[in-house]
């Protein structure tokens, strides 16, 4: 059963500005594992990484707003070239991300298991 759908779209240049000015946003958004990956990237890669993680976490939040998940508890990772996020046991999250030169969009479909 579908319990929620969330979508988010952002401009990449916003995230390049964030990356060039401070690490505060990354520390508030990312889990410790995500931060470890983030620190290994150059500024352009960091901007893309943040944009993808922000849009996915926003889409997840919108799809599961009745639960009010914390962004730092949502860990995004890639498996078989698809983004994944372990949430809570009885909810399955289906995620999709799309890119253009200027924008990143993400959608989340949250389904109740069982």
From Swiss-Prot:
Keyword Transmembrane: no
Enzyme Commission numbers on file: 2.7.8.7
Cofactor(s) this protein requires: Mg(2+)
GO BP, sorted A to Z: fatty acid biosynthetic process
Compartments in which it is found: Cytoplasm
Residues at which Mg(2+) binds: 8, 58
Class of the enzyme per the UniProt entry, highest EC level: transferase
Domain of life of the source: Bacteria
Entry keywords, A to Z: Cytoplasm, Fatty acid biosynthesis, Fatty acid metabolism, Lipid biosynthesis, Lipid metabolism, Magnesium, Metal-binding, Transferase
Pfam families recorded: ACPS (PF01648)
Family named by the database record: Belongs to the P-Pant transferase superfamily. AcpS family.
Record-given protein name: Holo-[acyl-carrier-protein] synthase
Species annotation: Mycoplasma genitalium (strain ATCC 33530 / DSM 19775 / NCTC 10195 / G37)
Gene: acpS
